[in-house]
Amino acid sequence: MTPEQRYFLDLTGYLHLRRVLSTNELAAAQEAADRYITMPPEEWPPEFGADLDRRDLTTYQHGFAFDRSLEVLTRHPAIWPFLMELTNRRPRLNGDSLGYNRHGHAFHSLHAGWRPEKQPDVRRYYIEEGKIRCTDFALFFYLTDVFPGDGGLILLPGSHKANFPRPRQMFYPGFEEEAYVGDTVPPGVHNVCARAGDVVIMPKHVTHGALSWKPRDRDRRFLIVRYNVQHMLTGQQHPFPDAIRERLDPETIELIEPWPYFQYKGIVVEREGLETAKAG
């Protein structure tokens, strides 16, 4: 992580990495995502699926495991340095979904993975020896373009350090009404307009949501990958059922396993060129 990236992430609570995926990587991931999204429910492999009646967003379960072109994104070389710094070389892949957002979907209301009154709880964001550490964060791999005015991901910059709970109706009053359309970006809110092949990194502490998707001829598709640290449990103990695990390669299996604090995973030892798996 460069000093500029570290400062921006600490200041705002997110990073927008541009043109992370190569042309070939993006094309393969787009093709795989399209197969999953357009697949009839009766053809879904075991443990795959989605709540097609959800009003604000469709999330296809275990998206990264659907195809190898999506699976390799979980440890893409361009994001690896960020995984290493945020987890202090102790990464655990603990969740994911393939997101699909179309015209007609409702506003995805603001939310976060923590509450200020619970600080630090089990989800922590802190600085250690000049490095950013975060025990729970997400990466958004964009498979389609988002332009200003389209809608999509919104966040409250700096909210990862908030000391007060957000008033529920602040920024988007009336959001709980059934016919509510949220398509504005009021002061204090940022709309992330990423292009296909970009990646957005965001601690789960950050308050975020999604504007109503406006284009009728285009949708928003993205792979969400969630990481925490290997020695802490902030979600399910076993988030991936056997039918999903059987599809994964050994490196991914190692990434999803819990691990002792004082031992580095094999993939970390190999990629970081460490002499020993013993962690200090």
Across the structure, where does each feature detected by a protein language model lie?
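Non-heme Fe(II)-dependent double-stranded beta-helix
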Residues: M1-T12, R18-E129
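Non-heme Fe(II)/2-oxoglutarate
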Residues: E43, Q169-F171, V199-I201, H205-G280
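A structural signal for short, well-ordered beta-strand segments
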Residues: D96-L98, L139-F141, L223-Y227
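Short, solvent-exposed loop/turn segments at secondary-structure junctions
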Residues: S22-T23, L98-N101, H105, D145-P148, ...
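Double-stranded beta-helix
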Residues: I132-D136, V146-T207
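Short, surface-exposed loop/helix-turn segments at secondary-structure junctions
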Residues: L57, A112-R124, Y172-G188, D217-D219, ...
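Active-site rim elements
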Residues: F66-V72, Y126-I127, Y180-H190, G209-S212
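A short secondary-structure junction signal
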Residues: H105-A112, Q119-V122, G149-G158, F164-R168, ...
